[in-house]
């Protein structure tokens, strides 16, 4: 085999120890990279104490983003292929063998694996997710039930459309895509959707297999820690707003477009501005536009919002005519107009240069899109 495990951690040392112990029972000599971005709970010292010649590790005393921590781990991989895991997982038999083979058989593919989960988020559907209660932690994990499931499904290696963060691929693919985006998403959330979209736009196939299997305890990692519990909701909101600042549309819009299952998916980012009479809806509108003509620079809004993003908000209100498309809203914003505004980047490429009225919006397409 020519594939490595990559595990990124931030504190949660006892969880990491259990994950490592279970992984080494199945794969005692497989290459493993553990990347620690700012852990302060003894993780660094524990990593240094391990006598494991097949382990490489990275540690930074500074708190890194989720993306930066995984990117640092990926950099250390010296095999052709790699698979990303979490420390709240149990790896099943045949996991690496099946991924290694399937990646060889399916070039230019980002391949996700199956995660069995307890019914904590049963209503949330995604590729590769199987709801079966085999325990909520390492302390009550039903190993026999898990092994039985793995044995029954180890040969079901057909690929189906769709992928998620629980992914594998050739290291060259991760390099080609520039890794995960640690600039936009601080400290976490949305980096997986962003990566998958960029992979699809680069021509990689997004697939999932049933025959590489893990058990995922869910909500055990640092993103669900006591440290994060009071900040998690705001961080998720900020990351989603930064996703829109980057792409101009929401994750849900990409999903509605069915980007993962299209043979040839395209999405063109262009500069779009809006002219508005007042700042009453600025919080709603700002992430969707590259330039905003308000007639002034709203310093109060910038001061309140800038700490939630690394994007330069003041620049949005400068050189406001430097756009490919300008939208004018002369009436109070209603829900119908807002719905149009949030999906304009999808619909505009079908129109020629010119001016169009849609509801209360005047759309001035100044350049060929």
Where are the predicted features?
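A conserved hydrophobic helix/loop-capping motif in glycosyltransferases and polysaccharide synthases
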Residues: 3-15, 19, 26-27, 35, ...
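Glycine-rich, basic loop-to-helix element that forms the pyrophosphate-binding segment
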Residues: 60-77
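Short aromatic/hydrophobic "clamp" motif used to bind/position activated sugar donors
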Residues: 82
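Conserved donor NDP-sugar-binding/catalytic core segment of glycosyltransferases
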Residues: 89-134
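A recurrent flexible, glycine/aromatic-enriched loop bordering the glycosyltransferase active site
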Residues: 137, 147-172
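A short, conserved alpha-helix in the catalytic core of glycosyltransferases
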Residues: 160-178, 184-213
């Amino acid at each position: 085999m020519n594939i490595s495990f990559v595990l990124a951690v931030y504190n949660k040392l006892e969880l990491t120890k259990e994950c490592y112990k279970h992984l080494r029972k199945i794969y005692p000599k497989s290459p493993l990279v553990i990347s620690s971005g700012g852990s302060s709970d003894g993780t660094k010292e524990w990593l240094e104490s391990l006598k494991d010649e097949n382990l490489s590790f990275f540690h930074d005393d500074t708190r890194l983003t989720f993306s930066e921590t995984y990117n640092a781990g990926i950099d250390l991989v010296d095999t052709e292929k790699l698979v990303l895991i979490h420390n709240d997982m149990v790896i099943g038999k045949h996991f690496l063998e099946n991924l290694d083979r399937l990646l060889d058989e399916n070039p230019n593919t980002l391949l996700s694996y199956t995660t069995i989960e307890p019914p904590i988020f049963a209503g949330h559907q995604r590729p590769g997710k199987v709801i079966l209660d085999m325990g909520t932690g390492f302390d009550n994990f039903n190993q026999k039930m898990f092994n039985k499931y793995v044995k029954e499904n180890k040969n079901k290696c057909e690929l189906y459309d769709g992928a998620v963060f629980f992914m594998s691929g050739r290291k060259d693919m991760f390099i080609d895509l520039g890794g995960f985006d640690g600039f936009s998403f601080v400290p976490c959330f949305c980096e997986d959707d962003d990566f998958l979209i960029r992979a699809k736009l680069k021509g990689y196939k997004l697939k999932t297999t049933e025959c590489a299997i893990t058990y995922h305890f869910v909500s055990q990692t640092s993103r669900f820690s006591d440290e994060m519990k009071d900040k998690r909701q705001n961080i998720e909101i900020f990351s989603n707003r930064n996703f829109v600042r980057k792409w101009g549309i929401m994750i849900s819009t990409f999903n509605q477009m069915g980007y993962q299952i299209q043979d040839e998916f395209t999405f063109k980012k262009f500069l779009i501005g809006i002219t508005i009479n007042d700042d009453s809806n600025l919080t709603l509108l700002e992430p969707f536009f590259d330039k905003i003509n308000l007639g002034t620079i709203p310093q109060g809004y910038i001061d309140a919002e800038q700490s939630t993003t690394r994007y330069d908000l003041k620049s949005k209100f400068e050189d406001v005519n430097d756009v490919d498309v300008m939208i004018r809203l002369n009436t109070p914003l209603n829900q119908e107009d807002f719905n149009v505004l949030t999906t304009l980047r999808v619909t505009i490429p079908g129109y020629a240069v010119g001016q169009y009225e849609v509801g209360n919006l005047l759309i001035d397409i100044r350049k060929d899109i």
